[in-house]
Each structure stands twice: as structure tokens, then as C-alpha cells.
């Protein structure tokens, strides 16, 4: 009697699980805020990767600022200092008028 070969089916994995990126958050934000229904998954993947890259770099630099001032936590002022002192980040955030609120603690 021949043994029947059983195929093991892989469980479906979401884009977030495969890429370890928060696609669903970016997708929902873009669709709600900009009413965009023409977003491809590759566009979401690219945008999410760019946002993650920028965030990690800013937080790394802000962590160094906090550490040099003898603190263990990153404060909003550390993020603001990083953006102000880095020419590329300053240019990136300049057109949109994005700023860090100094009153947040």
C-alpha cells in the first residue's frame, strides 16, 4: 500500500508578519487621512520601510544626546535637538512645518 503524501500547508502570514513592519497602521492611516484607494502593497512596503529607517535613526541620535546629558530616557527636547542639528533632517522636516512640541514630557 502506497503511503499518501500529506502536504503541510503553511499558515498564512500577513505582510506585517513577513516583513516585521507595521503595514496595517500605515495602510489605515493613508486610507483614512488621504482617502486613497490606489495604494499597492509595494508602495506601502516602501513607505513603511522609509518611516522605520527615519525613526530608528532619529531615535538612535536622540538616545546619544540623552546619554551624553546623563539621562536614561529620551525627552522630546532630545528629538528636537537632533532634528535642528542635523542638516538633512532639518531640510526633511522644514517644508511640512513639523515640529516637536516642547510642552510634552
Swiss-Prot record:
Full protein name: Histone H2A-like 1
Primary role: Atypical histone H2A which can replace conventional H2A in some nucleosomes and may play a role during spermatogenesis. Nucleosomes wrap and compact DNA into chromatin, limiting DNA accessibility to the cellular machineries which require DNA as a template. Histones thereby play a central role in transcription regulation, DNA repair, DNA replication and chromosomal stability. DNA accessibility is regulated via a complex set of post-translational modifications of histones, also called histone code, and nucleosome remodeling.
Keywords from the named record: Chromosome, Differentiation, DNA-binding, Nucleosome core, Nucleus, Spermatogenesis
One GO cellular component term: nucleosome
Family membership: Belongs to the histone H2A family.
Species: Mus musculus (Mouse)
Upper lineage: Eukaryota, Metazoa, Chordata, Craniata, Vertebrata
UniProt gene name: H2al1a
Pfam family, one: Histone
Transmembrane segments: none
Compartment list: Nucleus; Chromosome
Reported tissue expression: Testis-specific.
GO BP terms: cell differentiation; chromosome organization; spermatogenesis
Assembly and oligomerization: The nucleosome is a histone octamer containing two molecules each of H2A, H2B, H3 and H4 assembled in one H3-H4 heterotetramer and two H2A-H2B heterodimers. May be incorporated into a proportion of nucleosomes, replacing one or more H2A molecules. Interacts with H2BC1/TH2B; preferentially dimerizes with H2BC1/TH2B to form nucleosomes.
UniProt signal peptide: none
Note: In contrast to other H2A histones, it does not contain the conserved residues that are the target of post-translational modifications.
Amino acid at each position: 500500500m502506497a503511503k499518501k503524501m500529506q502536504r503541510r500547508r503553511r499558515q498564512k502570514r500577513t505582510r506585517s508578519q513577513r516583513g516585521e513592519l507595521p503595514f496595517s497602521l500605515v495602510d489605515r492611516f493613508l486610507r483614512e487621512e488621504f482617502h486613497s484607494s490606489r495604494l499597492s502593497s509595494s508602495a506601502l512596503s516602501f513607505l513603511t520601510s522609509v518611516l522605520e529607517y527615519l525613526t530608528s535613526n532619529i531615535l538612535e541620535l536622540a538616545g546619544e544626546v540623552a546619554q551624553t546629558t546623563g539621562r536614561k530616557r529620551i525627552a522630546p527636547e532630545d528629538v528636537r535637538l537632533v532634528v535642528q542639528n542635523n542638516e538633512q533632517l532639518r531640510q526633511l522636516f522644514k517644508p511640512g512645518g513639523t515640529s516637536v512640541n516642547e510642552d510634552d514630557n
